[in-house]
Amino acid sequence: MXXXXGYLEFDGARQQSFLYPLFFREYIYVLAYDHGLNRLNRNRSIFLENADYDKKYSSLIVKRLILRMYEQNRLIIPTKDLNQNNFLGHTSLFYYQMISVLFAVIVEIPFSLRLGSSFEGKQFKKSYNLQSIHSIFPFLEDKLSHFNYVLDVLIPYPIHLEILVQTLRYRVKDASSLHFFRFCLYEYCNWKNFYIKKKAILNPRFLLFLYNSHICEYESIFFFLRKRSSHLRSTSYEVLFERILFYVKIQHFLKVFVNNFPAILGLLKDPFIHYVRYHGRCILATKDTPLLMNKWKYYFVNLWQCYFSVWFQSQKVNINQLSKDNLEFLGYLSSLRLNPLVVRSQMLENSFLLDNVRIKLDTKIPISSIIRSLAKDKFCTVLGHPISKATWTDSSDSDILNRFVRICRNISHYYSGSSKKKNLYRIKYILRLCCVKTLARKHKSTVRAFLKRLGSGLLEEFLTGEDQILSLIFPRSYYAYKKLYRVRIWYLDILYLNDLVNHE
């Protein structure tokens, strides 16, 4: 962080958020290369090598493009001529791709510095991978069992491009950068619409920047109001809807209730709220009454409609009662399960039986949606009956077997945190039988004859992996009694959703 801050010491421009001069600074490209700002892009950096065009280029080309843009406006080309205009051996699509990535890299610098400064002085567990999707579930296991309601919110996206420009104005102060951003944004949409039929690969870094800036502005307002409502221990939700002199009103409001209704004061305390954002959605978990949850719901609707000028319907905010409803969360169906327990209490010569209830987070596999995904990819029918994969019969036996084993292991790895493994075993069974039918079809034989000829050793690859590893971790007596069926294990190396989750 100190080295990144040293790069940006130029005439106080960093303090004023003047980013446009950075387009002409050579060390910015060195910073992008040395400090790994291109990690958000799963491909290689566009400043080093572009796999689509197989060309290498440097910051000098970027400077020439910007100068030419101001001199003759030749970058503003009609959509139908996008592939016909060449400059330095590249098409105009290459210009937009390169400049949009450059803009994203430069604007990421103050965001990265601000994010890094917020983490200074805070300690995180080294073994806790915050990038992993599965890192959310241990947190929810500890917290959701104490709550009863969850708001499931679909985060809307701005329809008009000027909303994104206005959002960036709060972060970037110089007009040159804003004008340049507006130009990149509109031209980017022009060639995106032209190439959408050809399924061209869009610039993921620029899209991630737009998404993160939009989300950052929304969450900054939400967390500000959430923090304000937590300053006073005994407050009501009036602070979120009527902010004028709310401290005086709340104090007077509490004074009345303390004098007249002391027994009800505990019901007015601001509950503890947990907020989690994932995959274009966010959830708000709290222990509230239905009335207060409805207030939170319409608060989100008014926030998006009034502040961001985005049409946001109340149907996009679902109120789930965890004890009755299932919450679709990252490919799992989560709910609260009540486990009744009987505790025997002994007091001198008298003994009592106490009924107790233990609340646990139940994570289940949505078997119906996964079967639809498998049926869509021709692994089984819509009823879950395995069929042969006809398109793979041209491959070798080892390739076919390796493909099925890889898919089966990925699914087992992702859904290792399910409370009950019955549905997971069913998915494995479908893939195993589909593999056998595919191999039997290739060799023009029946499944029974094929297995009889090769033996059961063919499917041993499916069995090696998670089950055998877990049998080594836990004691043999633990594994012998099949308690492993209820063990949930969350892997902290999963960074992306499983393909079968995105069945929609």
From Swiss-Prot:
GO CC entries: chloroplast
Main location group: plastid
Location(s), subcellular: Plastid, Chloroplast
GO terms classed as biological process: mRNA processing; RNA splicing; tRNA processing
InterPro entries for the chain: Domain_X, Maturase_MatK, Maturase_MatK_N
Alphabetic keyword roster: Chloroplast, mRNA processing, Plastid, RNA-binding, tRNA processing
A Pfam family it matches: Intron_maturas2
Superkingdom to which the source organism belongs: Eukaryota
HAMAP family in the cross-refs: MatK
Similarity annotation: Belongs to the intron maturase 2 family. MatK subfamily.
Free-text function comment from the UniProt entry: Usually encoded in the trnK tRNA gene intron. Probably assists in splicing its own and other chloroplast group II introns.
Name the record gives this protein: Maturase K
Organism from which the protein derives: Lepidium campestre
